[in-house]
Amino acid sequence: MKVIDLIHSNKKTAFSFEILPPLKGTGIEKLYQTIDTLREFDPKYINITTHRSEYVYKDLGNGLFQRNRLRRRPGTVAVAAAIQNKYNITVVPHILCSGFTREETEYVLLDLQFLNITELLV
């Protein structure tokens, strides 16, 4: 169901939650535990935030620095799909246009389309 329809059809205060994907290298279980706790509030949807890439600079020791792109919280699309499938709650991935190339943005949108995730915050 579309978020706007969920909001309009609700006769009482409605809740939604914004979550962060797990840090790179960690699992999703802690996130599931958090959602299990929050489900008692009957959230109408869950927003999954995307974090843009960060840049760190490595000193090469010769007066030059190497710029490296780092994504600490990848997985917005995968987390959205996992939540939607596990909990049957509408998900709203927050997709950024900065920090990604046009091609990367297109791939994210295509992945969401394939997963039938149609509600987006851009």
Regions found by a protein language model. Give the residues of each.
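Generic structural signal for well-ordered alpha-helices
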Residues: 1-4, 32-36, 76-81, 109
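Hydrophobic faces of well-ordered beta-strands that scaffold small-molecule active sites
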Residues: 13-21, 44-48, 91-95, 120-122
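Short histidine/acidic/glycine/proline-rich micro-motifs that form metal-
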Residues: 21-23, 53, 96-100
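Glycine-rich anion/phosphate-binding loops
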Residues: 26-32, 97-114
